[in-house]
Amino acid sequence: MELRSTQTPDILPSYWYNIVPDLPEPLPPMIHPSGEPVKRSELEVLFPRSLVDQEISTQSRIPIPEAVRETLLMLGRPTPLIRARRLEEALKTNARIFFKYEGVLPTGSHKINTAVAQAYYNAVESVERVSTETGAGQWGSALSLAGNIYGLKVRVFMVRASYLQKPYRRILMEAYGAEVYPSPSTKTNTGRKLLAENPDHPGSLGIAISEAIEDVVLSGGRAKYSLGSVLNHVLLHQSVIGLEAIKQLELLGVERVDYVIGCVGGGSNFAGLSYPFIGYNYNNGEPPVFIAVEPETVPSMTRGEYRYDYGDTAGLTPLLKMYTLGHDYIPPPIYAGGLRYHGVAPSLSILVKNNIVKPVAYPQDEVLEAGLVFARTQGILPAPESSHAVKAVIDVALKYRGASEKPTILFNLSGHGLLDLSAYTRNH
C-alpha cells in the first residue's frame, strides 16, 4: 500500500458539509439572557449576512464559492493523507495509522480553511476590519493572512499567556499586517477591568473573545467579529478536511476506518475531520469510534455540564447550549493554548451527549511525550494541541499489539509545532 495519498486539485470538494440536519436531535437555538432566541438581525451586528446564512442553515451541502476554492488551492489544499508506518513499527501494533496533515498550510494549521472563507465573505460585504481572539496564535495567524489576501484590516487579541510563551506567532501575525494585543489588554473596558484586578492576568480565550466583541460593537459598524471555532459556520468550513480524507482513503484502497481521532478546544479541527464520516454513514452502518481529546486541565467534555452558557467571559455573546466549565473559568497557562476554552461547540456537545463521540482527557506531560514519539518516528513535531490526538492514537494502537485484528486509525494532525518549541524544550 502507498504511504501517501494523491493531492490533485479535484480532491478538494466543491461544497462544505453541514452536520446540523443530520444531528440526532435538533440544535438548541442561541438565546438571550432573557431566554428569548437571538434574532438574525442581532447576529448581523457581529457577522456578515452570508455567514449568518450559513450559521442558521439546515442544508447539508453548501457550495464553496469558486474564489474561495481557488485561494484554498493556492495555499496548499488538498492536504496530504499519510500513513504513519514508522510509528506503527515503533509501537509494534497491527493497527494501520493514517493522519491528515494540516501543518503543510502556510500558517501551519487547519485554521486557514475557515479564515479564507470568513475573510472572503467580509470583503464581499465591504467590511473594513475584522477583530478576533486567538489562543496559541494559529487562528490569529490564519486570519491575518486571509485578511491580507482579501484587503481587510485585522485586529487580534491574543491570550496573554500565549503572547508571552509564543512570541514568534505574534511576529507572524504582524508580518501579515495584523495589529496584535495581549489579552487582557488596555484597548477595551473588559481588559482594563481585569488588569486592574490582576496586572499579571494570564488571560483566556473567553476573555479574548469578550475583547474582540467589545471592539466590534464600539466600531460604529466598521468592523465585524471573526472567530476560529465553536459556531456552525466555522465547523462546516473545516469539513474540507474530512471530505478530502474520504476521497483519499478510497484512492489508497482503504475500505473502512475503525477510529477517527482529533483534539478539541472549541471543536473545529475535530469536526472538520469527523463530521463527514458521521454524516455520510461511513462503513455502511458500522461507524468508526470517534474519540475527542482534551487537556485534563480544561476538561469541558469529560467534567463540564451540558447547559446554556456564554461563549465569552464578560457575557457579551448569546448563550449557547454546550458542555461548559463555566464562562468565568480561567484555565491554567498550559502550552496547548488553542485548547484553553471553557466550552465546546454546540453540535459536538450533542454528539457527545448522545454517545456518538467519546471524550477523553490527558495530562500535559503525557501529551508532550507522545508528540516527541511522533517527531522521532515520523519526522514531524506536532503542535501541543495536535499531540493530544497523537497520545490517544498511541493508546488505541497499543491495544492491538500482537492482536489478530488490524484496525485502521485516522487522526487529524491539525498543525506543526515549529513555533511551539518552548513547550518541548522545557518539558524535556
UniProtKB/Swiss-Prot annotation:
Gene3D superfamilies per record: 3.40.50.1100
Sorted UniProt keywords: Amino-acid biosynthesis, Aromatic amino acid biosynthesis, Lyase, Pyridoxal phosphate, Tryptophan biosynthesis
Enzymatic reactions: (1S,2R)-1-C-(indol-3-yl)glycerol 3-phosphate + L-serine = D-glyceraldehyde 3-phosphate + L-tryptophan + H2O
Q: What class of enzyme is it?
A: lyase
Cited InterPro entries: Trp_synth_b-like (IPR006316), Trp_synth_b_CS (IPR006653), Trp_synth_beta (IPR006654), Trp_synth_beta/beta-like (IPR023026), TrpB-like_PALP (IPR001926), TrpB-like_PALP_sf (IPR036052)
Classification via SUPFAM superfamilies? Tryptophan synthase beta subunit-like PLP-dependent enzymes (SSF53686)
One GO location term (cellular component): cytoplasm
The terms under GO molecular function for this entry are: L-serine hydro-lyase (adding indole, L-tryptophan-forming) activity; pyridoxal phosphate binding; tryptophan synthase activity
Specify the signal sequence span: none
Annotated TM spans: none
PTM N6-(pyridoxal phosphate)lysine: at which residues?
K111
- Swiss-Prot/TrEMBL cofactor(s): pyridoxal 5'-phosphate
This entry's Enzyme Commission designation comes to: 4.2.1.20
Pfam families reported in the protein's UniProt record: PALP (PF00291)
Pathway(s) annotated for this protein in UniProt: Amino-acid biosynthesis; L-tryptophan biosynthesis; L-tryptophan from chorismate: step 5/5
**Protein purpose:** The beta subunit is responsible for the synthesis of L-tryptophan from indole and L-serine.
What HAMAP family does this protein's entry cite? Trp_synth_beta
Q: Which family does it belong to?
A: Belongs to the TrpB family.
Subunit details: Tetramer of two alpha and two beta chains.
Q: What protein does this entry describe?
A: Tryptophan synthase beta chain
